[in-house]
Amino acid sequence: IILIEGIRLKMGIVVIGQREYESNQISALAWGTLSVSIALLISPTMGNTGLKAGLFGAPIIFGLCVVDPVMGEVKRRTEGLKTAILLGLFASYVVWLGCWYFLGTPLLASVILAPLTVIGELPKTKSIDDNATMVFFPLIGVILLQPWL
């Protein structure tokens, strides 16, 4: 991921689907790929195997896949950050509580970590894309909460 992105940046290539400004900064695709890879590697499994081993990794990744486009579209269509946050929270809770029901994600973790996915959408910085912060914020949260789960 890092090598390919480095080559792309060095050559100033903009891949189909990327924004023009990504020709000289790390792309959202690279940030998302890197953060999801890290989440898959270090998300606690709580001793589970198979699909149930994704009790934290799945909602973190689904959160990125669902909440990011929901909030992005709401912001684009309504230009209302408050509405985007409220609908993002709703979508995030649907994801996290769905994983509580289907995968056994601890309810306490679902309630606490769902807002962190939404908070990850809010920072506007050129240093790191929201595709990464939407994964890293709940991932850091689950790592810090793990002793109490």
Feature locations, PLM:
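Interhelical loop and helix-boundary elements at the membrane-water interface
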Residues: I1-L149
